[in-house]
A protein has these predicted regions:
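S-adenosyl-L-methionine
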Residues: 76-126
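A generic alpha-to-beta junction signature in SAM-dependent methyltransferases
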Residues: 42, 65-66, 105, 109, ...
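Conserved class I S-adenosyl-L-methionine
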Residues: 44-54
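The conserved SAM/SAH-binding core of class I Rossmann-like methyltransferase domains
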Residues: 72-74
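C-terminal substrate-binding/active-site "lid" region of AdoMet-derived donor-dependent transferases
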Residues: 49, 82-83, 88, 118, ...
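Glycine-centered, small-residue-biased loops immediately flanking beta-strands
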Residues: 46, 69, 156
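Class I SAM-dependent methyltransferase Rossmann-like catalytic core
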Residues: 1-46
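Conserved SAM-binding loop of SAM-dependent methyltransferases across substrates and taxa
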Residues: 55-67
Length: 182
């Protein structure tokens, strides 16, 4: 029943149709496009990290519009190659994945951040229980936020998508302590 409803929504979704026409892998591209049109956080020559990248539409947009940008993407799921994107398939929360990022980004304990933008569209496998799904996503967001604090240059940008729920306000409060605009 739910998969039939999803198929129906996809068939009637103008963003799904637009993504197909414009060559984006998913409708999610328009979320990052809309945010960038409002806040202008991407520029050519930046270093961008895309966590939870599959199927790749956020990285695809950045690579397409800002071709001189270095993009490092990571996801548990494989993505088809995107010109200008270095991809790692693995669990962002694992030591191995973090070592890969540290190496690619030249991050050490003694360096300041080297990244201009960290974006996270990570989502857990959902179980259908809203509170549980929300809490699982908040754990992933906290990992992404902690990484952003270490990896971002001064004045860098952290972009994250979240399910709404009870734990959101606490994380937003923490983020506001470190970023000017939230």
């Amino acid at each position: 029943k739910s998969s039939a409803a999803w198929i129906q929504r996809q068939a009637n979704d103008s963003y799904v149709e637009r993504a197909k026409k414009e060559g984006y892998r998913a409708r999610a591209a328009y979320k990052i496009i809309e945010m960038n049109e409002k806040y202008h956080f991407f520029k050519n020559g930046q270093v961008v990290v895309d966590l939870g990248a599959a199927p790749g539409s956020w990285s695809q947009y950045v690579a397409r519009e800002f071709p001189k940008t270095k993009i490092f993407a990571m996801d548990l799921l494989e993505i088809k190659p995107i010109n200008g994107v270095v991809f790692y398939q693995g669990d962002f929360t694992s030591d191995e994945a973090l070592r890969w990022l540290e190496e690619k980004l030249n991050l050490t304990d003694s360096t300041n951040g080297t990244v201009d933008v960290v974006m996270s569209d990570m989502a857990p496998n959902t179980v259908g229980h809203k509170k549980t799904d929300h809490l699982r996503q908040m754990v992933l967001l906290e990992y992404a936020f902690d990484f952003a604090l270490c990896a971002l240059k001064k004045g860098g940008t952290f972009i994250a998508k979240s399910f709404t729920g009870g734990a959101t306000n606490d994380l937003v409060k923490q983020i506001k302590e470190h970023f000017e605009d939230v």
